[in-house]
A protein has these predicted regions:
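TRNA-recognition modules of translation machinery and tRNA-sensing kinases, especially anticodon-binding
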Residues: 127-415
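N-terminal alpha-helical targeting/anchoring segments
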Residues: 1-132, 150, 154
């Protein structure tokens, strides 16, 4: 959540950030501006009434001590107190309205984030490893998976519905091996391995920014204040919800393997075949809580940690700087890692590393103490990696002419 003080003192800065995102919020933003104007006016009136109450109370005390008639002052105090209580209630209600609007305003766009109108304006930063030259036409992963008997898409539909799959046989061993490899690499890079619940309450989803704006994107448990997590970013970040840590404990670096659940609202017709876009998938996540001065360096560290895994698996990939219009709700700056898929003849996102600055920390009240003063931390998150998409990339990049899959050396010891 952005700072309420910033909204009150520099409304134009917030409006400009929304414009950079191609998200002007239209009439809603105008109504918010009207509420803020009304709030400021009432706040001035309230301060005036409080000052008057203090002044008259002081006079009342003096006259009481002098044993002078105070009936007029008493009446003034009583009338002013009624006005004061009514106005205090009104100001409180306006503050709630402002905070409710604040909860659906996305993060401020970072100065480092380039301007753009759509994902077409994202900027390639660098490429790592050269895509292989095939002597045959490479197949897509769903063909290879079915040929090798690794993924059963029909059973996924039978057990649940479309966008679910069953992984079995040697494919399941590869899937498990990838998870172990990812966690080992992340641990080597200083991230603590943590296993968390796959269910969280509403407060936790508010803390990381999924609620209230993106309620359609998450699965809710009927008759319970519980939701299936869309990412371990939610659980890892919120381990420090409403917490103050000493500055000496920063940075806090965490990694977790969890199932993730997403409704994929608005994705009808996209990636309908295969494992690219599923309602349930596994992901190994990185989350860091840092001092504000260290978050930029941490973002680079997290990117390199994820890239290191792809290099070990001999998978060509690239770093892509997202433009302002393609940023996620909580992100101030995001760099994607896209892996090469020869079957599709294109790069596809496999990791997204975001610096949210103090946006999530303000929502979740994540603070640190330095020089006896509490300050908001910075939080970062990123995939390291999406397991299903990594398996997709492994199959497509390491396929042989006969449809068999070469296993990279780094993965052999896990099988």
């Amino acid at each position: 959540m952005i700072d309420r003080k910033l909204l009150l003192q520099d409304f134009d800065k917030v409006a400009l950030s929304l414009k950079k995102r191609n998200n002007a919020m239209g009439d809603e933003l105008e109504r918010l501006h009207e509420v803020i104007t009304h709030y400021k006016k009432q706040l001035i009136e309230l301060e005036g009434l409080q000052a008057f109450q203090n002044k008259v109370s002081k006079e009342f005390g003096i006259k009481m001590a002098q044993k002078v008639d105070t009936s007029d002052l008493k009446k003034e105090l009583e009338n002013n107190k009624i006005k004061l209580n009514e106005l205090s209630k009104s100001v409180g209600e306006l503050e709630q309205q402002i905070d409710l609007k604040l909860s659906i305003i996305p993060n401020l766009v970072d100065e480092k984030t380039p301007l753009g109108a759509s994902e077409e304006d994202n900027i390639e930063i660098k490429k790592i490893l050269t895509p292989r030259n095939f002597t045959f036409k490479p197949k897509e992963h769903f063909e290879l998976a079915q040929q090798n008997g690794w993924i059963d898409f029909e059973s996924g539909v039978k057990l649940a519905k479309s966008r679910f799959s069953v992984i079995r046989g040697f494919g399941a061993k590869i899937y498990r091996a990838l998870i172990h490899l990812m966690l080992d690499f992340n641990e080597k890079n200083g991230f603590e391995i943590i296993y968390t619940p796959a269910l969280v309450n509403e407060k936790m989803l508010f803390g990381t920014g999924q609620l209230p704006k993106f309620k359609e994107d998450v699965f809710k448990i009927e008759n319970e204040n519980l939701y299936l997590i869309p990412t371990a970013e939610v659980t890892l970040t919120n381990l420090y919800n409403d917490t103050i840590v000493s500055v000496e404990k920063l940075p806090i670096k965490m990694t977790a393997h969890t199932p993730c659940f997403r409704s994929e609202a608005g994705s009808a017709g996209k990636d309908t075949r295969g494992m690219i876009r599923q309602h349930q998938f596994d992901k190994v996540e990185l989350v860091a809580i840092t001092h504000p001065k260290e978050s930029d360096v941490m973002q680079e560290h997290m990117l390199e940690s994820a890239s290191e895994i792809l290099k070990a698996l001999e998978l060509p990939h690239r770093f892509v700087q997202l433009c302002s219009a393609d940023l996620g709700f909580s992100a101030s700056n995001t760099i994607d890692i896209e892996v090469w898929l020869p079957g599709q003849n294109c790069y596809r996102e496999i990791s997204s590393v975001s610096n949210t600055r103090d946006f999530q920390a303000r929502r979740a009240k994540i603070r640190f103490k330095e020089n006896q003063k509490n300050q908001l931390a910075h939080t970062l998150n990123g995939s390291s990696l999406a397991v299903g998409r990594t398996m997709v990339a492994l199959m497509e990049n390491h396929q042989q002419a006969d449809g068999s899959i070469h296993i990279p050396k780094a993965l052999e010891k896990y099988l």
